[in-house]
Amino acid sequence: STAGFYQTDKGVREAINFNVGWRFIKQDVTGAEKHDFDDSAWSVVNLPDGLELLPLAASGGVNYQGPAWYRKQFNLNETMRSKKVILHFEGIMGKSKIWVNGAMIKENFSGYYPIHIDVTEYVDFKKPNTVAVRADNSNDKTYPPGKSQEQLDFTYFGGIYRDVWLITHNHTYVTHPTAAEKVAGGGVFVHYENLSEKSVDVFVNVDVNNEGKKMTVFVQLDLLESDGKAVASSVKEYQLPKKNAVQTHAQ
């Protein structure tokens, strides 16, 4: 990822960099998930964070293995009240639990897939909010890589080792591939057939979810050359009932 510390351009879907200003401690702490927990004595870190710095030759088993905590306070402005609010973690190594304002909203077992969480019902628009993350990279054979770290010839560290985003969008939206829980069906799914030197058939599925009132949506797909010129386009109209979803198909 190239998130750095920059905010993306505003649009229907706004992604705000959430990397800066986390509190961190490399140990387990009782009660750290609570909204009013005092974390003022913890270190301040910016993400991504791999728990520690290790020498160049650091194979599996040399690194710290165990729980660590991250906490961050944030405010939401009134313009977001009509939107869905999403926390998107690109990667938390090991077992993780995530709380917002003291409510546990996600438990995850994998360090390699993103965690895309709808927190709309848990956030406050008038007072500061708190997100707390417990990340545990201890040995656990129930998820990848599936063996003790001492048996590995590499170190996968721990912590929130990839970027984090606060995302807002409308209640009618293109779903996220992992959050949709549809095999090869969430988000935008593209595959190719009949490939030759002269042509190729491009198939695109777009998963659109409507959590608002009944409405008409238009799904537009453009195939662009490297210079940005459109060489093919498709526009389809769909009637979406209240609180319903549709998968669009284009060739």
Annotate each predicted stretch with a short phrase.
Residues Q27, L47, E107, S233-V235:
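Residue-level detector of high-confidence beta-strand sites
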